[in-house]
Each structure stands twice: as structure tokens, then as C-alpha cells.
Amino acid sequence: MPKYYLVVSSVTTAQRLQKLCREAGISVSVVHTPQGLTDRGCSYSVVVKEPDFPRAQSLASENQLPVRQQFLYQDGEYIECP
């Protein structure tokens, strides 16, 4: 199943978004952003399954948690989302 990576600047932001998602019934995980996806050094990503991606985006926005970039991971490839 395709997954989305919501890239954030700190582990604290990632954990806050993770908590909000879990409270909303969305299963997510926090990981170091895969190497090569960003040029900003160390960052973290909140990984969410495709059906829950729009709600996770909304939760980040509603709670003023800045998402730097978003990527779709499918068939072994990362595709940046607008």
C-alpha cells in the first residue's frame, strides 16, 4: 500500500503530529527522513498510509505544525507532492 511521508524539521514536531493523528484514530510512525529526500540535513517524517493522508495533512494545518515537504512512497520510489 502506498505511504506518504510528511517531512518536518524536528522530532518534537513529528511527535506532536503523531499524537494528534493517533488521537484521531490514524496509525502513523515517526522516522528519520530517508537520505536524499531533503537538502536540509537532519529531519523527521511522519509516515501515514494513503487513505489517512488527507486527514493527517489537515491535522498538521489545523494545529499550525509546519510540514516542509510531502512525498508519496510507492513501488520503491519517492515522488514529491505539491
Language-model segments: what does each one mean?
Residues 1, 31, 66-70:
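Short flexible/disordered coil segments
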Residues 2-5, 9-22, 26-50, 54:
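Amphipathic, hydrophobic secondary-structure cores in small proteins
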Residues 49-82:
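C-terminal structural segments of small proteins and small subunits
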